Amino acid sequence: VDLTAEEKAAVLALWGKVNEDEVGGEALGRLLVVYPWTQRFFDSFGDLSTPAAVLGNAKVKAHGKKVLHSFGDGVHNLDNLKGTYAALSELHCDKLHVDPENFRLLGNVLVVVLAQHFGQEFTPELQAAYQKVVAGVANALAHKYH
């Protein structure tokens, strides 16, 4: 990811304040509501029939937590995203057959959730840096597909 030293510092500083457990569930839940076709990858999660059901679903929250912890690994390894996500890229490509576009969608949803949580602190400059990070993570996760 092509970030300046200042952008890296800002990304890491904000990430230190992120409640990964809470934000992960919100981000995955929002993805499943805003882009309902992504629900097909989560058949085992039970009731996803309404936004309230999705957002209140314990399995969505638990998997969102797992996803965000993994994203945090990337935030702390910005210079080696492909290496950080090599195994997950292979899993999502070969076994789960997830459309890599979904990684981009989730990244964009995560930026929205961060903006909600941090309000004025999530400046346009910080958003721009996070957009670079989520794009880098999405590209790393899609690496096996190429």
UniProtKB/Swiss-Prot annotation:
CDD domains: Hb-beta-like
Modified sites of kind N6-acetyllysine: K59, K82, K144
Residue positions where N-acetylvaline is found in the record: V1
Keywords: Acetylation, Heme, Iron, Metal-binding, Oxygen transport, Phosphoprotein, S-nitrosylation, Transport
Origin: domain of life: Eukaryota
Domain Globin residues, every copy: 2-146
Stored InterPro entries: Globin (IPR000971), Globin-like_sf (IPR009050), Globin/Proto (IPR012292), Hemoglobin_b (IPR002337), Hemoglobin_oxygen_transport (IPR050056)
Pfam families per UniProt: Globin (PF00042)
Single GO molecular function: oxygen carrier activity
Organism field: Rhinoceros unicornis (Greater Indian rhinoceros)
Binding site for heme b: H63, H92
Name used for this protein in its record: Hemoglobin subunit beta
Record's subunit section: Heterotetramer of two alpha chains and two beta chains.
Distribution of this protein across tissues and organs: Red blood cells.
Cellular compartments per GO CC: blood microparticle; haptoglobin-hemoglobin complex; hemoglobin complex
A GO BP annotation: hydrogen peroxide catabolic process
Family: Belongs to the globin family.
